[in-house]
UniProtKB/Swiss-Prot annotation:
This is Actin-histidine N-methyltransferase. Pfam families: Rubis-subs-bind, SET. One of its GO terms (cellular component) is cytoplasm. S-adenosyl-L-methionine binds at R75, E104, G105, F106, R254, D275, M276, C277, N278, H279, S325, G326, F327. The SET domain specifically recognizes and binds actin, suggesting that it does not accommodate substrates diverging from actin. Residues 10-20 have a biased composition (Polar residues).
Length: 589
């Protein structure tokens, strides 16, 4: 949102006069599509694939230099037109102004005192760019024929944005002209800036984002050049990778879900004015009023005249903020790292553990989270770890007898341990696992802090190093917390303290002190699901059109604990090899 526009905005009136042969670009994009549709690389080979894809993309960018349609002047020059347009079409424009807040970029500043929970901003549907408005635009005929556009609302919005940007008479021109000219998402990172994310959890999503975007561009370049319904689009003579990267990032950093006009389902939308608000910790204070058919936002807190107006974007980790929003949020109370856990099928007690977990509604293998806040684990992760560490006798107690159901219900309740021994085992396991994850990083926490302090880094490089530092700090906190808990329960066991008794009124699988206890099970977020959908759809379409000869491999879900440990060992070994062979990394850091 506002924060994502910190970078310089480059604009000019029309596309440049440079020419490049469509056949030449078509040949390069076909090669790019082939590369991006090949099977996923093996462990330790992702960086090599990323560099190869990037090399092709840069070759295309170089040939297309000067062909994009951009605007004259600075972004802020268009803010008065945006406010006028919004006011004329029923949006609220009183009580705030758009201002550059330096570190956070552009945002909204209160021009009067605004009380907490006061409705201060509303934007009617007619101003929003939505999948529905895209279907009713010049993009409609192509949308009706293309399965990717139909399956992927975010891609539809990106093309809607590009088509309207190329139309000087577009209703949305005042909004589009006010958008940033570029972003700080990893799609804009230089190769050296991406290198700072080596060994982090986030790097895999960064690679995936870059590969997916390149594949989409390559696929749609051919569609625009060859599909009969693309003939009338204003993109045929000028559809550059730079254009697509900008549109994808604009949508990625700004898209939100709103209900359709009849309220029967949700659709994706870009919301002018509102998307200028920067993020802070808090609660969601934006909703959609179906009766008045408008997006409405109430104040998160009291804002005095002259103060920046913030909103809360949601319970996102810093990895999600960096990858999908293009900024790092210091002191993010919802920051977390992923931890893959699973019961090995070679475990002698696998069947019993799987049954107990199934009754608790927890899969035998999943991606959980370790949280920035205390306690570091959710009720669901606690329940999983308890089952993971159970003895045969403890498993029987949770499967048989009149109290079995009650025991299942208390698995996630931190007040009622299965046994002192079970608690010691689970906290020992978590301590060991978090320690193992920490060892996969090339640098230490102290080295990252020193590097940030002593080097003049770009905004994007700073974000990358802060992100890897944040991951390590969460893991280190988890190690320390697990060690404290391990010793506490060991003492309880040594003292033969009585186990707490539970009452029926205390039951509840997810009743614990951890906020967002449902987060770990939905950690495979919309972007991941959408990525698989998009890849499947593109592969089907490409095969149908004879564009791709190779196969496409997809993740088969989570693997066993044993497999995951093996992968982490390989990752650590691979990182060590990269570290020893990469002289530029050693010099820079």
């Amino acid at each position: 949102m506002g924060k994502k526009s910190r970078v310089k905005t480059q604009k000019s009136g029309t596309g440049a006069t440079a020419t490049v042969s469509p056949k030449e670009i078509l040949s390069l994009t076909s090669e790019l599509l082939q590369k991006c549709s090949s099977p996923a690389p093996g462990p330790g080979k992702e960086w090599e694939e990323y560099v190869q894809i990037r090399s092709l993309v840069e070759k295309i960018r170089k040939k297309q230099k000067g062909l994009s349609v951009i605007f004259d002047g600075k972004r802020e020059d268009y803010f008065p037109d945006l406010m006028k347009w919004a006011s004329e079409n029923g949006a609220s424009v009183e009580g705030f102004e758009m201002v550059n807040f330096k570190e956070e970029g552009f945002g909204l500043r209160a021009t009067r005192d605004i009380k907490a929970e006061e409705l201060f901003l509303w934007v009617p549907r007619k101003l929003l760019m939505t999948v529905e408005s895209a279907k009713n635009s010049m993009l409609g005929p192509l949308y009706s024929q293309d399965r990717i556009l139909q399956a992927m609302g975010n891609i539809t919005l990106a093309f809607h944005l590009l088509c309207e940007r190329a139309n000087p008479n577009s209703f949305w021109q005042p909004y589009i002209q006010s958008l940033p000219g570029e972003y700080d998402t990893p799609l804009y990172f230089e190769e050296d800036e991406v290198r700072y994310l080596h060994s982090t959890q986030a790097i895999h999503d960064v690679f995936s984002q870059y590969k997916n975007t390149a594949r989409q561009y390559a696929y749609f370049y051919k569609v625009i050049q060859t599909h009969p319904h693309a003939n009338k689009l204003p993109l045929k003579d000028s559809f550059t990778y730079e254009d697509y990267r900008w549109a994808v990032s604009s949508v990625m950093t700004r898209q939100n879900q709103i209900p359709t006009e009849d309220g029967s389902r949700v659709t994706l939308a870009l919301i002018p004015l509102w998307d200028m608000c920067n993020h802070t910790n808090g609660l969601i204070t934006t909703g959609y009023n179906l009766e008045d058919d408008r997006c409405e936002c109430v104040a998160l807190q009291d804002f005095r005249a002259g103060e920046q107006i913030y909103i809360f974007y949601g319970t996102r980790s810093n990895a999600e903020f960096v990858i999908h929003s293009g900024f790092f949020f210091d002191n993010n109370s919802h920051d977390r790292v992923k931890i893959k856990l699973g019961v090995s099928k070679s475990d002698r007690l696998y069947a019993m553990k799987a049954e107990v977990l199934a009754r608790a509604g927890i899969p035998t293998s999943s991606v959980f989270a370790l949280h920035f806040t205390e306690p570091p684990i959710s009720a669901q992760l606690l329940a999983f770890l308890r089952v993971f560490c159970m003895t045969e006798e403890e498993l029987k107690e949770h499967l048989l007898g009149e109290n079995a159901i009650d025991r299942i219900f208390t698995l996630g309740n931190s007040e009622f341990p299965v046994s002192w021994d079970n608690e010691v085992k689970l906290w020992t396991f978590l301590e060991d696992r978090a320690s193992l994850l920490l060892k996969t990083y090339k640098t230490t926490i102290e080295e990252d802090k020193s590097f940030l302090k002593n080097h003049d880094l770009s905004v994007r490089a700073t974000m990358a190093i802060k992100l890897r530092l944040g991951e390590k700090e969460i893991l280190e906190k988890a190690v320390k917390s697990a060690a404290v808990n391990r010793e506490y329960f060991r003492k309880q066991m040594e003292d033969k303290a009585p186990l707490p008794r539970y009452e029926e009124s205390n039951l509840g699988l997810l009743e614990s002190s951890v906020a967002d206890s449902s987060l770990p099970l939905v950690l495979r977020n919309l972007e991941e699901e959408v990525g698989v959908q998009e890849a499947l759809a593109i592969q089907a379409e490409a095969n149908e059109n004879g564009l791709v000869n190779g196969e496409r491999s997809f993740p088969n879900g989570t693997r066993s604990e044993e497999d995951l440990k093996q992968e982490e060992r390989k990752r650590a070994k691979g990182d060590a090899k990269e570290s020893s062979s990469d002289s530029t990394d050693a010099v820079k850091e």
